[in-house]
Amino acid sequence: MRLFLSLPVLVVVLAMVWEGPAPTQAAPEISSTLGRIPDKLKEFGNTLEDKARAAIDSIKQSDIPAKTRNWFSETFNKVKEQLKTAFS
């Protein structure tokens, strides 16, 4: 039974090996790849900067920071009052 299963798998693997790499999978030259690295890094940095600025701007324009700050200050004051009454 194992032989019946392994033979077709072996045939498929050998066919893939004999076919070779597809044209899109061919390895590009190392010098051209290394030459494009600075451009890719700059593009990545610009994209990251734009996304970070957009996120920060949306946070600044929303009222979430003010609500969060108010909630923390109210909660802190409540805890402080409870501790003051508990230890007085």
Swiss-Prot record:
Subcellular location: Secreted
Signal peptide range in chain numbering: 1-26
Cellular component annotations (GO), alphabetically ordered: high-density lipoprotein particle; very-low-density lipoprotein particle
Keyword presence, Ribosomal protein: no
Keyword terms: Lipid transport, Secreted, Signal, Transport, VLDL
Pfam families: ApoC-I (PF04691)
Disulfide bonds: none
One MF annotation (Gene Ontology) recorded for this entry: phospholipase inhibitor activity
UniProt GO BP: lipid transport; lipoprotein metabolic process; negative regulation of cholesterol transport; negative regulation of lipid catabolic process; negative regulation of very-low-density lipoprotein particle clearance; triglyceride metabolic process; very-low-density lipoprotein particle clearance
Keyword presence, Transport: yes
Function: Inhibitor of lipoprotein binding to the low density lipoprotein (LDL) receptor, LDL receptor-related protein, and very low density lipoprotein (VLDL) receptor. Associates with high density lipoproteins (HDL) and the triacylglycerol-rich lipoproteins in the plasma and makes up about 10% of the protein of the VLDL and 2% of that of HDL. Appears to interfere directly with fatty acid uptake and is also the major plasma inhibitor of cholesteryl ester transfer protein (CETP). Binds free fatty acids and reduces their intracellular esterification.
Family, per entry: Belongs to the apolipoprotein C1 family.
Protein name: Apolipoprotein C-I
